[in-house]
């Protein structure tokens, strides 16, 4: 609109923006139910009450609306024949899946874990890939002594290992109470290795001599950082959580330092106890090279004269030594019932005190498998009984009072 010279020109906003402000025809808003077929109250395929059958769709629906809800969300259907423990959480599926087999061989006291492959792992490196490997721990009692590890696969989010890791000395008590922790990590040569995800499998899910297949999504359970990398406040929280975990697991929980295979037999002909030191497995590493130089000592207590000590030879640079040595204690069966056999494993060091790795006591005051092994030996003379035992970090009473050499 133009005015005369000198007059103020007025233009309304509608004319300036050329917008038609008149409302058009009001159309009904579609509801979400309009995009999906409705099941009628009648039998399937029939339309009772005018409802749309399950197999029919209204002609006005777009192709996107005809797709099933799972296709709209990008979901996939797992294979019917595979044994899959699936998770619906996006946080878990984003980490990837791990496929593996577990087999508990009760006769040989071995737990076999075959790591097959992983799929869709979370990228951890700048190139959008990862360098994944798998490590195993047995809980409770996770430590370097019972850690097993696969090889590292380079630059892949879908690694294939097909690698078998084996735990020796697994007892029925372990199967009842322990949990296998399977962690997938990314190896980084320039900094610390990064945690991707983990799976925890209670061993009680396994049946003896029956292989069980798993294909499970990784879970986001990042382990606590090391004390050196934490502030004072975080260290306090870490200590509190560890104390809480120990309280939940029960009092008197000791750190596991490996396993030892012992043979006991009372000889009625020789009137004495035969103690066989067969082998050890998954010993704790005491040297800077990641190994130990282990040997085994045995005592039959109480030992007033200190003459009951026996010692095996030293095995160099190994965490799984084989000894196959036998010691004999001349003693009557009635007296043996009041004694305690203490077996300790040590790391030999030149020029300094030897390091205690772990020990186990068998006798009337023992518990669990150690007590059962001792009682079976007393009640089954002239029979060699081999059993695996867990070595713990606590030094048996008065064991340190004897020379370590």
UniProtKB/Swiss-Prot annotation:
Residues 94-216, 256-389 form the C2 domain. One of its GO terms (molecular function) is calcium-dependent phospholipid binding. Ca(2+) 3 binds at residues 287, 347, 349, 355. Ca(2+) 2 binds at residues 287, 293, 347, 349. Residues 1-94 are annotated as: Interaction with UNC13D and DYNLT1. Interacts (via N-terminus) with UNC13A. Interacts with cytoplasmic dynein light chain DYNLT1. Interacts with UNC13D. It is a peripheral membrane protein. Residues 34-54 are annotated as: Disordered. Residues 42-54 have a biased composition (Gly residues). Its cofactor is Ca(2+). It holds the Pfam family C2. InterPro entries: C2_dom, C2_domain_sf, Doc2, Rabphilin/DOC2/Noc2, Rabphilin_Doc2_C2A, Synaptotagmin. GO terms for cellular component: extrinsic component of synaptic vesicle membrane; glutamatergic synapse; lysosome; neuron projection. SMART domains: C2 (SM00239). Calcium sensor which most probably regulates fusion of vesicles with membranes. Binds calcium and phospholipids. May be involved in calcium dependent neurotransmitter release through the interaction with UNC13A. May be involved in calcium-dependent spontaneous release of neurotransmitter in absence of action potentials in neuronal cells. Regulates Ca(2+)-dependent secretory lysosome exocytosis in mast cells. It comes from the Eukaryota. Brain and mast cells. It comes from Mus musculus (Mouse). Residues 220-405 are annotated as: Interaction with UNC13D. C2 domain 1 is involved in binding calcium and phospholipids. This is Double C2-like domain-containing protein alpha.
């Amino acid at each position: 609109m133009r005015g005369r010279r000198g007059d103020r020109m007025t233009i309304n906003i509608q004319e300036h923006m050329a917008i038609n402000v008149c409302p058009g025809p009001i159309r009904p808003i579609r509801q979400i139910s309009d995009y999906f077929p409705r099941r009628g109250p009648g039998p399937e395929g029939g339309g009772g009450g005018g409802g749309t059958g399950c197999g029919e769709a209204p002609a006005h629906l777009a192709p996107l609306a005809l797709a099933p809800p799972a296709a709209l969300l990008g979901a996939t259907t797992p294979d019917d024949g595979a044994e899959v423990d699936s998770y619906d959480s996006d946080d878990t599926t984003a980490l990837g899946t791990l496929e593996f087999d577990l087999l508990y061989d009760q006769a040989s006291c071995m737990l076999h874990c075959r790591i097959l492959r992983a799929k869709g792992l979370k990228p951890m490196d700048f190139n959008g890939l990862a360098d994944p490997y798998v490590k195993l721990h047995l809980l409770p009692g996770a430590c370097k002594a019972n850690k097993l590890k696969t090889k590292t696969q380079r630059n892949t989010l879908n690694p294939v290992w097909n690698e078998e890791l084996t735990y020796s000395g697994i007892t029925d008590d372990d199967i009842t109470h322990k949990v296998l922790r399977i962690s997938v990590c990314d190896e980084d040569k320039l900094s610390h290795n990064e945690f991707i995800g983990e799976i925890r499998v209670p061993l009680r899910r396994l049946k003896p001599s029956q292989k069980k297949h798993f294909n499970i999504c990784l879970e986001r359970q990042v382990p606590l950082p090391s004390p050196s990398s934490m502030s004072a406040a975080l260290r306090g929280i870490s200590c509190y959580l560890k104390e809480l975990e120990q309280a939940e697991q029960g009092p008197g929980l000791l750190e596991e330092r490996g396993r030892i295979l012992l043979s006991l037999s009372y000889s009625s002909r020789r009137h004495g106890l035969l103690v066989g030191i067969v082998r050890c497995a998954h010993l704790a590493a005491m040297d800077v090279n990641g190994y130990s130089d282990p040997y085994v000592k045995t005592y039959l207590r109480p030992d007033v004269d200190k003459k009951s000590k026996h010692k095996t030879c030293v095995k160099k640079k190994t965490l799984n030594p084989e000894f196959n040595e036998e010691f004999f204690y001349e003693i009557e069966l009635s007296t043996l019932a009041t004694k305690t056999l203490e077996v300790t494993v040590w790391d030999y060091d030149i020029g300094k005190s030897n390091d205690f790795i772990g020990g186990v006591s068998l006798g009337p005051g023992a518990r669990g498998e150690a007590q059962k092994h001792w009682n079976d030996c007393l009640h089954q003379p002239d029979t060699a009984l081999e059993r695996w035992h867990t070595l713990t970090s606590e030094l048996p009473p008065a064991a340190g009072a004897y020379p370590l050499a």
